UniProtKB/Swiss-Prot annotation:
Its EC number is 5.6.2.-. Residues 918-931 have a biased composition (Basic and acidic residues). PANTHER family: DNA REPAIR DEAD HELICASE RAD3/XP-D SUBFAMILY MEMBER, REGULATOR OF TELOMERE ELONGATION HELICASE 1. Keywords: 4Fe-4S, ATP-binding, DNA damage, DNA repair, DNA-binding, Helicase, Hydrolase, Iron, Iron-sulfur, Isomerase, Metal-binding, Nucleotide-binding, Nucleus. A probable ATP-dependent DNA helicase implicated in DNA repair and the maintenance of genomic stability. Acts as an anti-recombinase to counteract toxic recombination and limit crossover during meiosis. Regulates meiotic recombination and crossover homeostasis by physically dissociating strand invasion events and thereby promotes noncrossover repair by meiotic synthesis dependent strand annealing (SDSA) as well as disassembly of D loop recombination intermediates. GO terms for cellular component: nucleus. It comes from Aedes aegypti (Yellowfever mosquito). Residues 7-333 form the Helicase ATP-binding domain. ATP binds at residues 42-49. GO terms for biological process: DNA recombination; DNA repair; DNA replication; negative regulation of DNA recombination; negative regulation of t-circle formation; regulation of double-strand break repair via homologous recombination; telomeric loop disassembly. The keyword Iron-sulfur applies. InterPro entries: ATP-dep_Helicase_C, DinG/Rad3-like, Helic_SF1/SF2_ATP-bd_DinG/Rad3, Helicase-like_DEXD_c2, P-loop_NTPase, RAD3-like_helicase_DEAD, Rad3/Chl1-like, RTEL1. This is Regulator of telomere elongation helicase 1 homolog.
Length: 1010
């Protein structure tokens, strides 16, 4: 791999770095050389991760060599000193020194080189983001350096009993109990297996690697990862492992002389605040009391619960009685706090939290004893629940333990002064639950058998909120971290970020993007195709006209945008509201006919499945791409890669401001106003509020344009983006390409967007994926004529349908056109062809583009009278090659200038109804389907509704790929669901695989009776 000298350090980089990459690596090395902190912004697609890894690991290697050389020099000096001493002492007095020198010399090897060499801690928001980074490291010249990821028991545990439990907290406490009682064989094998070849040979191990290796050697991956920390050059972990004091302690993280890299650092402010905050409810305290009481009853009445090493208690009934007394007093104290319900609660200084707990005799002096008692009780509950079906699960105790660890994270007057400055205590009425059931925490700790106490009228919620992210960052600096580097594609503006973090920043960088104007099209879309203003403000988002216009805007963009389209909403409620409204009005179905729609789910498993299905649609050579509707700050907007055809455009439907009336938001704005001075450059509350929305937008935009050859469109569909403040808070590289016309109509935007993609497809390199999605075009076929004598008179329903077609820009493909001949080899997925080549894939030929009758233009066409076309075909239109500011191409031939429509008497086939044709009464056993497959498809296409025909094609394609006969039959029975279509159903035997023919015949006999 090529080597480059950057700031005196040799860096191996896979290719000649761009200037932005050189600048970035130079700043990283500058931070490490001078032991300073840095804030570095480089847009997504500029190779930020690769540059970060190569520069930091190169510096660590350089430092290792430097330390090793210094050690050898020192050993040489010591040997010379020893020889002098031996001569003075008669030759034998230095035996002890010789032994010491031998040890020093042995330590001068690879292991000795680690002495004094900083370790890198690479933190990001999620494990999936870290897995991508580790994969990138494996592809560099530094893949020989040791890297390991830290994960939770939920991800790493392979114990058959523990791993089946729901929730990380349950697994954690059950694991601790088994380890303590030495009943986990996987844990017992960690020490003996950590030097096994299977472990040593895996230099870089992510979650999947750890589980795979741990399963192979039958050693616990969770504890194995902790053993590998010492020898690792770089550690990977989520933010909370690093920022949360309790997590740092649990993972034995040593921060001193460590290089801390915080990637995706636009989240760091929020993570710092949240990791230092807590919330506890009266219900949680009541659960604690119930749990303690239940255990006391067990112990007091000597209930026959067998006790072994695993379930042995580390507390007495007197300990429980004392704890219960404290909890009862805490409950009484919280319940007695006066709260103004009309004002949404009361706010107190941060130190008020100590007053609350001190009234229950929980204070700095005895906190550690109480914390240990809580941990012992939680572990005990976990073990007896597993063994004896005990109904308590300790959810409230877990919440209390975590709350105390945050409240008493420090001690002394200085700590209390920081609490008073950075924290607020907010107390509000606890809402009455509408339904009876289980109290489930975010981590799933409280289980299904948990008994839930009723919420009292005077129940409260006590929130202990940190509003200064610098509080957490200073804890890292206070532990003597060598350097802290914050980096992301969306950090700007840097000044307010640096001010809030409250740590010294010596190195700053705002990199430009490496793409040019031909690769990005940025538009502010202030109104929809119906000229309705697009504004997702709180006061307008219930406006049916706005919701409808937004839907039609997305619908209009879909045919123009190739591949994947990402649509981001400000919140889940607004996404759900739009989805429901569009489904009711039919807009959702119209979008789906152009591109299938996927919606971001909240559950982890459903999310992974949805993403997989989305990528499959994008990769489908016969598909039209897909639409993914998601939420700003959601999973899709953070860290996922939608390069190339996976994301050719992103639509931002609004500004994702935090909820204005939320107590935490109100207090954050108030806090900033209180601490803001001219000297500290801290932003105002209103500026912070606006910046929160802008950063979420910038992050969502960053999902597209992921590398130097990528291209895409950014469509800001909210007229508030015209405001100067909102524009100025967009990433600088986006502002550079932003149009300045505030009153640009919808039509010209469509035209410019269409030309942008046509031009990009011509001049920019196309990815491998895009070849699978390129639209196949054939020679244009003549328009189907229809002669209408006199005026065309249509009834109200027909007029409404035509108006709907015109307004919503729907084109239905020519149902009468099938080209070429069919070969079974062509039915299989084949490499795609360029637009100029003859199509080779049978199904893609069925969707080839032809000239169209433009039903959006209600003028009429003049056509030859000799046509034998039996139907009025409404075709997919062919993309215009000229410059066009309209959605639809202009008439391409001179003969079409004078237009009229004439009607030929013809049997009408309803393209949209599933009702039976009255002309057909049932299954005709003598009726035969065409032998030729192409002719058969022609007949099918004209015999069933369009929606069923498209589903039919999808069924055949899937069957050819997965050979799932049951799914094939299910799809065919839906397509041919009437007796008069059974002859077509029987004809489908020619598409069935040989080993499925007998099953097909049996099914046909069952359905058709013959």
């Amino acid at each position: 791999m090529p080597e480059y000298q950057i700031n005196g350090i040799t860096v191996n980089f896979p290719f000649e770095p761009y200037q932005v990459q050189r600048d970035y690596m130079s700043r990283v090395i500058e931070c490490l050389q001078n032991s300073t902190n840095g804030v570095l912004e480089s847009p997504t697609g500029t190779g930020k991760t690769l540059s970060l890894l190569c520069s930091s690991l190169a510096w660590v290697l350089h430092k290792k060599a430097q330390v090793q050389a210094n050690m050898r020099t020192n050993i040489t000096d010591l040997k010379e000193f020893e020889m002098v001493q031996r001569k003075k002492l008669g030759g034998d007095g230095g035996s002890g020194m010789e032994e010491l020198l031998d040890k020093l010399h042995d330590g001068c090897g690879p292991e000795g080189a680690k002495w004094g060499v900083p370790k890198i801690v690479y933190a990001s928001r999620t494990h999936s983001q870290l897995t991508q980074v580790m994969q990138e490291m494996k592809n560099t010249s530094y893949s020989f350096m040791k890297g390991v990821i830290l994960g939770s028991r939920d991800q790493l545990c392979i114990h058959p009993e523990v791993s089946k439990e729901e929730g990380n907290s349950t697994k954690t406490n059950l694991c601790k109990a088994k380890v303590q009682s030495r009943t986990c064989s996987f844990y017992s094998r960690v020490e003996s297996c950590k030097e096994r070849p299977e472990v040593v040979s895996n230099v870089i191990m992510d979650i999947e690697d750890l589980v795979k290796v741990g399963t192979k050697v039958r050693a616990c991956p969770f504890f194995l990862s902790k053993e590998l920390i010492e020898s690792a050059d770089i550690l990977f972990m989520p933010y909370n492992y690093l920022l949360d004091p309790k997590a740092r302690k649990a993972n034995n993280l040593e921060i001193s002389n460590t290089i801390i890299i915080l990637d995706e650092a636009h989240n760091v402010e929020k993570m710092c605040e949240e990791s230092a905050s807590m919330q506890i409810r009266s219900t949680d305290i009541a659960l604690c009391i119930d749990d303690v009481t239940s255990i006391m009853k067990v112990m007091d009445h000597s209930v026959a619960i067998p006790e072994d090493d695993e379930t042995k208690k580390d507390f007495t009934i007197d300990d429980l009685a004392l704890l219960k007394e404290m909890l009862l007093q805490l409950e009484k104290t919280v319940d007695s706090i006066p709260v103004m319900f009309s004002q949404g609660g009361n706010t107190f200084p941060g130190t008020y939290i100590f007053e609350i707990f001190e009234k229950a005799n929980i204070k700095e002096g005895n906190y550690h004893i109480i914390a240990q008692l809580l941990e012992n009780i939680i572990q005990y509950i976990a073990t007896i629940t597993e063994k004896n079906n005990f109904v308590r699960r300790g959810g409230g105790l877990q919440i209390l333990a975590e709350a105390l660890s945050i409240i008493f994270a420090g001690s002394g007057p200085e700590y209390r002064a920081s609490i008073d400055k950075c924290y607020k205590v907010h107390i509000e009425i606890e809402e009455q639950k509408k339904t009876r059931g289980n109290v489930k925490q975010a981590d799933g700790w409280t289980a299904t058998k948990q008994l839930v106490p009723s919420v009292k009228a005077n129940a409260k919620v006590v929130s202990f909120w940190c509003f200064n992210p610098g509080f957490g960052m200073r804890q890292l600096l206070g532990r003597n971290a060598r350097s802290i580097i914050l980096t992301s594609g969306t950090l700007a503006p840097l000044k307010p970020l640096i001010s809030e973090l409250d740590i010294p920043i010596a190195v700053r960088l705002e990199n430009p993007h490496i793409i040019d104007g031909s690769q990005v099209c940025v538009k502010i879309v202030g109104q929809g195709p119906d000229k309705e203003s697009l504004n997702s403000s709180y006061g307008n988002r219930d406006n049916p006209k706005y919701i409808s216009s937004l839907g039609r805007t997305i619908l209009s963009f879909c045919p123009i945008i190739p591949g994947g389209l990402l649509v981001f909403f400000p919140s889940y409620p607004l996404l759900n509201k739009c989805q429901e409204a569009w489904q009711e009005t039919g807009i959702w179905a119209q979008i789906s006919r152009t591109k299938p729609i996927f919606v971001e789910p909240r559950g982890k498993d459903q999310f992974l499945n949805t993403m997989s299905e989305y990528y499959q649609k994008i990769n489908d050579p016969d598909g039209k791409g897909a639409v993914f509707m998601a939420v700003c700050r959601g999973k899709v907007s953070e860290g996922l890669d939608f390069a190339d055809m996976n994301g050719r455009a992103v639509i931002i439907t609004g500004l994702p401001f935090p909820p204005l009336k939320d107590a935490r938001v109100i207090l954050k704005k108030k806090y900033l106003q209180e601490v803001r001075t001219r000297e500290n450059e801290i932003i105002s509350g209103d500026e912070w509020y606006s910046l929160e929305a802008a950063r979420a937008v910038n992050q969502a935009i960053g999902r597209v344009i992921r590398h130097k050859n990528d291209y895409g469109a950014i469509l800001l569909c909210d007229n508030r983006f015209h405001n100067h403040r909102q524009k100025s808070q967009l990433s600088s590289w986006i502002q550079k390409h932003l149009n300045t016309n505030q009153h640009q109509n919808f039509g010209p935007i469509i035209g410019e967007l269409s030309r942008f993609f046509r031009n990009a497809e011509k001049i920019l390199p196309q990815s491998k994926l895009s070849r699978n999605i390129v639209t196949l075009v054939q020679e244009p076929t003549p328009l189907i004529e229809c002669n209408i004598p006199g005026a065309l008179i249509v009834n109200r329903d027909t007029k409404r349908k035509l108006d709907d077609i015109r307004n919503n820009f729907v084109q239905i493909e020519n149902s009468n056109q099938v080209t070429s001949t069919f070969r079974i080899s062509d039915y299989e997925q084949a490499p795609s062809q360029s637009a100029s080549n003859e199509p080779k894939n049978f199904l893609s030929r069925l969707n080839t583009q032809v000239h169209s009758i433009d039903f959006n233009d209600m003028t009429t066409y003049s056509m030859p009278s000799s046509s034998q076309g039996a139907l009025v075909g409404i075709h997919k239109r062919e993309r215009s090659t000229g410059s066009d500011n309209s959605i639809f191409s202009q008439t391409q031939t001179a003969t079409q200038k004078k237009r009229k429509v004439v009607l030929i008497p013809q049997q009408v086939i309803n393209l949209t109804s599933d009702d039976e044709d009255p002309g057909r009464t049932g299954d005709d056993p003598t009726r035969q389907a065409p032998e030729d497959r192409v002719e058969l498809i022609k007949v099918i296409k004209t015999s069933i509704p369009l929606a069923k025909y498209q589903a039919f094609l999808s069924t055949l394609t899937n069957y050819n790929k997965d050979r799932n006969f049951d799914r094939l039959m299910e799809g065919l029975l839906v397509a041919f669901d009437r007796p008069e279509l059974y002859y077509l159903l029987r004809a489908m035997r020619r598409f069935v695989k040989g080993d499925h023919e007998a099953r097909f015949d049996a099914k046909i006999k069952e359905v058709c009776g013959r």
